[in-house]
Amino acid sequence: GWLDYHQCKWPKGFKEEEVTEYFLALNEQYLSIKNEKIISFSHFLPRIDLMPSFIPANFRIVYPALGTSHLEEQVRILNPIIHVYGHSHVNQHIVKEGIRYINNAYGYPHETNISDKQLICIYET
């Protein structure tokens, strides 16, 4: 199983879907925010197509643990100009359906070819 299941203490009998639903529910109170410009954040990927196509097939085994499309549904409700996400160790700056998605990964020390390991400015007024 994934390390997340060994390092986290979930309530006894909690299923994967219930873990997802629990964390999605924490976001509900913020989904009605309406500002001229919103920058949203999540630890997990809101959509798997944010992963670049150059990722070798043998590394795609982790894809089911990277995020959920239900998170993307919440991002769409907020309609941010930028959504910053993590969990993947692969840097990505891409626009999908009008939203700029950014992952500025630091990754593990040996992952120098997929992460820049530097701070970046994502928005200026």
Language-model regions: role of each:
Residues G1-V62:
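Active-site-proximal loop/helix segment associated with metal-binding centers of metalloenzymes
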Residues P52, A57-I81, H89-T125:
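Binuclear metal-dependent phosphoesterase catalytic core
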Residues H43, G86-H87:
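Active-site glycine-centered loops adjacent to acidic/histidine catalytic or metal-binding residues
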Residues G1, G13, N27, N35, ...:
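Residue-identity detector for glycine
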Residues I39, I82-H83:
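Hydrophobic "anchor" residues on beta-strands that sit immediately upstream
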